């Protein structure tokens, strides 16, 4: 579905990761002609990137989004490419960005869309994984921000429209959105102790139902708090024995069979994950039935993956614990010579 201005969480985190916040952004004609809601920029006006990020996230200004995109990517099209690359890196497969502001758009490859699950993944990246997560949280938690253009000719002020920040203890971050295609949208995060919950809503009502997103967010957050707790889902895995074709056996016998052990490569003692009572975590082991010599010590030969239904929690590589050499022609020749020499 269309996601409207919730798009701007990706615009913000990309700008934070790619550029310095004190860089000067020069406004283009393309940015100026963006539809409302807008800051009201003027062509060739200059702003600090940091101030435009507050404009982007607090007031959801569409002209600021385009100015940021053009500064970071060189053009809106190139910035959208960066957005899609980052989305793929995060693990999104059904998200497609065309604009940096979330205005309804389509091109030869499809419409500007995402899913609620993938929007939540992007928010998780912004607040928990990105090297700029603290900067992202600082901006999105700020209640108001005043600034001027670089030349100090005009003054501006922005106020945070994320009502969720005042609705629940631990409310952490969020972004609203609305377009005709998207309806009212919201993505927000809450943290209580070690637990972090993210809610993503798409098409959550149309006018006159602006308040639905707040009610639904609170209801879903309360459900998460009441029903989900951290559990250590890590299971101790035994080493796996695998035959090695044409490998030199450990006893060195001419007709002996070589085997090798594979172990899960991790030093982790715990794998904490939020699950509901009654839910079970599945473990999928992918190991070949046979290896081909030579096999160097430490080679990755498979994986052990933890799943909750279709969601991948964690994947660990399986490596071999020793080196197995190949039975070469020279090795056979040497062995035959040794046999005859002993007679």
Predicted regions and their residues:
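Active-site-adjacent loops and short helices of periplasmic peptidoglycan-processing enzymes
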Residues: 1-134
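Domain-terminus/edge residues, biased toward the C-terminal soluble/receptor-binding domains
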Residues: 110-343
């Amino acid at each position: 579905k269309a996601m409207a201005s919730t798009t701007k969480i990706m615009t913000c985190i990309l700008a934070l990761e790619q550029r310095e916040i004190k860089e000067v952004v020069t406004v283009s004609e393309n940015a100026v002609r963006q539809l409302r809601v807008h800051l009201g920029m003027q062509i060739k006006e200059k702003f600090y990137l940091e101030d435009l990020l507050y404009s982007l996230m607090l007031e959801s200004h569409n002209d600021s989004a385009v100015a940021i995109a053009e500064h970071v990517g060189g053009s809106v099209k190139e910035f959208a490419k960066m957005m899609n690359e980052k989305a793929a890196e995060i693990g999104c497969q059904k998200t497609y960005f065309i604009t940096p502001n979330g205005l309804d758009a389509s091109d030869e490859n499809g419409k500007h869309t995402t899913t609620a699950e993938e929007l939540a993944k992007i928010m998780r990246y912004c607040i928990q994984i990105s090297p700029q997560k603290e900067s992202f949280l600082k901006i999105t938690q700020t209640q108001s921000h005043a600034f001027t253009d670089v030349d100090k000719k005009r003054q501006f002020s922005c106020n945070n429209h994320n009502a969720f920040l005042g609705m629940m203890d631990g409310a952490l971050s969020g972004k609203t959105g609305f377009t005709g295609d998207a309806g009212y949208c919201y993505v927000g995060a809450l943290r209580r102790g070690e637990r972090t919950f993210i809610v993503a809503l798409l098409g959550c009502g149309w006018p006159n139902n602006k308040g639905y997103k707040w009610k639904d967010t609170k209801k879903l957050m309360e459900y998460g708090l009441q029903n989900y707790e951290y559990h250590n889902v890590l299971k101790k895995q035994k080493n796996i024995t695998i035959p090695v074709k044409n490998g030199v056996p450990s006893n060195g016998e001419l007709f002996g069979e070589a085997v090798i052990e594979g172990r899960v490569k991790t030093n982790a003692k715990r794998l904490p994950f939020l699950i509901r009572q009654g839910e079970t975590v599945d473990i999928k082991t992918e190991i070949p039935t046979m290896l081909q010599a030579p096999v160097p010590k430490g080679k990755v030969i498979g994986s052990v993956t933890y799943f909750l239904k279709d969601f991948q929690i964690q994947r660990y590589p399986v490596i071999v614990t020793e080196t197995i050499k190949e039975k070469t022609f020279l090795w056979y020749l040497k062995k035959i010579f040794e046999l005859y020499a002993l007679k």
